Design a protein with these regions (language model features):
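A structural micro-motif
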Residues: 45, 68, 99-101
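Phosphate-handling DNA/RNA-contact segment within nucleic-acid enzymes
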Residues: 1-66, 83-84
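Short secondary-structure boundary/capping segments
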Residues: 43-47, 87-91, 118-122
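Conserved nucleotide-binding/hydrolysis micro-motifs of P-loop NTPases
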Residues: 34-35, 53-55, 77-79, 107-111
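C-terminal or mid-to-C-terminal helical accessory/interaction module adjacent to the motor/catalytic core
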Residues: 98-167
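Arginine/glycine-rich "motif VI" loop of SF2 helicases in the C-terminal RecA-like domain
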Residues: 62, 90-98
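Acidic beta-strand-to-loop metal/phosphate-binding motif
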Residues: 27-29, 67-79, 84, 104-105
């Protein structure tokens, strides 16, 4: 990083991805360069990767300049899903009525690279129908963490998951 270049302000492949907006104005945000390369090789060219950092507010604000519907599709392993959860917690406060962020959750031991190489472009494109809005992603994660049969658990967990809304 330098004074002029900050990883948290850019994406790998953004210049190329801007040329390939699809009819839904989607862009896939993936974790790694190899994910971008594999998806691109199979014809999915509206894809970028964060540059070895957690997804930042500045990166999403940059993406929104070019795409209305970013889809965060991190690896299906535990670390990838933890990174997705951290991204959701970080990005939800900057949401407004005109912004969208979707999440696409891969199964355990899959990443975009392995998924498309194993199942192909048509399957990946169809799988994109499973994307969910950031708010639903956060609720799903929350309910995976709590014991819904234990009201005390719900109360304690709720205190840890209050998300501020911008007015």
């Amino acid at each position: 990083e330098t004074e002029f270049y900050k990883k948290g302000n850019n994406f790998y492949n953004l210049d190329s991805a801007k040329q390939y907006r699809d009819k839904n104005d989607n862009v896939y945000i993936v974790e790694g360069y190899m994910d971008v390369i594999s998806l691109h090789k199979f014809g999915i060219k509206n894809v970028v990767a964060n540059l070895g950092t957690a997804v930042t507010e500045r990166q999403i604000e940059l993406i929104w300049k070019f795409f209305k519907n970013p889809i965060i599709c991190f690896d299906g392993d535990e670390s990838g899903q933890k990174a997705a959860t951290r991204a959701a917690d970080r990005l939800f406060p900057i949401m407004n009525a005109d912004s969208n962020i979707h999440f696409l959750t891969l199964t355990e031991n899959m990443d975009p690279d392995s998924y498309i190489n194993e199942k192909g472009k048509d399957s990946f494109t169809k799988f994109t129908d499973n994307k969910i809005l950031i708010s639903n992603f956060i609720w799903n994660r929350y309910f995976q963490e709590v014991d819904v049969n234990n009201p005390q658990s719900l109360t304690l967990q709720t205190g840890n998951h209050i998300i501020p809304f911008n007015s």
